[in-house]
Each structure stands twice: as C-alpha cells, then as structure tokens.
C-alpha cells in the first residue's frame, strides 16, 4: 500500500504539471503528444476501454456487497431464484447489480457540480465510518495485539518478483487516473498545489486503508478460527461481515458502496464522457458518453472477471500494458521534447489543420505505444519465456519504462 501510494502520487504530480501550468484538460494535453488526430488512440483507451471495464468491475463488487445488506435485512434473500443464474450471475446478485447500476447512472446524470459535491462529502464520511469499523474489528479480533501479530498465510512463498508484481497490479488499478490526471490538476491554483496535495492525500488515505484492511482481516481470521483465503474476490466484504453486529455491518457496507460509487462516477464514467465528447462532439455529450460506458460495462459481463482471478490478473496486465506506455510517452514528450513549454495555438488547432504533425498524427508516439504494448503483453502469448513473463507481470512499470525510453530515442526532436 505504501509503495503504491508513493508511486501513484509521483505519477499524479509529474503528469499533472502541464495541465496545472496551462489549464488544459487531458483531451488537449494528449493532442500535443500524439497529434490532433493521433490523440484519439490514447483518448479512447483511457475513456472507453478502462471506463467500460471499471464501471462493470466496481458495480459488480458493490452488488456483491449489497447482497450481504439485503440478506441481513431480508433473511433468505440470497436464496432467491433457487440457484438460477442470468448470464452466469445469480438472481439475487443480478438484482443488486441492477440497483447499483441505476444509482450510479442517476448520480452521474445529476451533473458534474453534483458529482463534485457528492465526492467531497462521500470520501470523509466513508473514512469516518471505516475508522469506527476498524475499532470494532480490532475489538472483535481480540485486541490490538492480535491485529499487530496477524500474518496472512500466503498460498505461495513471497518473493521479490511476486512483491513487485503485486505492486504493479495495484498501481495499474490507478493507472488510468495517472494518465488523465490533467482533468483534475487543470483547476489547481498553482503548479505547487498538486506537489503538496497529492503525496499527503495519497499517503494518509492509503495508510489508513491498509490499517482498516489489516484490522478487518484479523477480525475475520479470529471469527473463522484460522486461515482465510486472501485471494477470494469478496474477502473484504466477508471481513466486514465478520464484525457480527447487523447494524454496523449494513452501515459499513453501505459506506463502502458510497465510496466505490463516487470512484466509478468521477474516475471512470466522467472520463469516458469527456473523451467521447472531445473526439466525437457531434455524436455524444458528456452525459450520453457516460451512459455508453455504463451499458457497455454491463454487456462485457464483468462478473466473469471477479469470479475468475486469472481473468482479473489478465485485465490488470492489459491496462498496465496500455497506460504505462501512454504515461511514459507523455512524460518524455513534456519534460524532454517540449522542455515544459507547450504551444497552445498548435494544441487548439483549427479543424482541418495538422497541428504540427503531418496528417495530424505523431506516428513516432503511436509507434512507440504499439511496440511497448506488444512487448509487455508478449508474456501472455509466450509464458514459457521467463523474461517476457516477468515483463508482463510488471506490465505497468515495464510499459512505463519502455514508452519513456522509446520516445526519448525516437521522438524527442524539438519542433520549431
């Protein structure tokens, strides 16, 4: 958690500096790096692929948590349908998914101002409730001593390679926001505000989350009387459920769902809407773009990902292989090719002009992105090649390095 928070905050600061300095959103920032037409490639990757999948993943996770709430309020809820499934999803969870999806969409359609206000009160409220839950979990685990001495039993030995792989996947979860953090930092009053705010905010929140997680896991271990499956997708919900008190369990799960909903609305549906609007203004508005993310995010059957950890790991490797190179190319372009100086007239080029790149596409950036993606994902096709398998396991880090170095080698020729 600590390593992830440090890495993510550094990514936010470095990649958000251009937007903070010039007040431009991600859609415009990416035009400088990839060209006014070439920008559609990374923009679609960020706004659509990640937005679609994360909407589905977050909503199904929230739905599984909501199952516990409904079963506490309406005993027997989880037996609805008698084991019948709908597209591979149990009927009770399908109902919970529909409810969470509708709530998320309604919040999104309320508008960006409401989203901002919702996020501002949701985050503190969630943490207050989680801290209360932490104290109850510690008590349930038999005291602070038991929590501090708690050590999950790994299914395989912990190695350096395994540790880096874990950190890479954790960072991949936040790789999308690293890429389009400019949509947030563009509103900063100065370039120094993100430098101070992100590290403090990330470190405090992640360390608190780590403490809460360990406390809940220790509580679950104490209640279950031994080892627990830390790889189980619903492990955190099970840990909350182990507290026992129905009112507290319901309150904590609802708080967790509020936080998850705020994340998917602000961190995934909104970027999807913004990117679709920026690239296809005649076809989409910010609201309709977000709705597309919700619909497609459901049609991909996201519950198949959370039910199969292999699929989930594949997804994190995939997004790491995409976002790592994009972030690396953007950093190399801004700090070395541009020397932190952007030409806004070129970025906001009139329709029909090339914006400083032949045909409006920076093929060097696009080429580096493609090569980086192929290299980092090759390990999935050739798992027997140890080097490629390791590169794939460290997809975000390796993709970032390959994209950064690759663009330094072929792309950093300063334009007049």
What are the residue ranges of the model-derived segments?
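Membrane-water interface regions at transmembrane-helix termini and the short interhelical loops
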Residues: 15-17, 33, 41, 99-122, ...
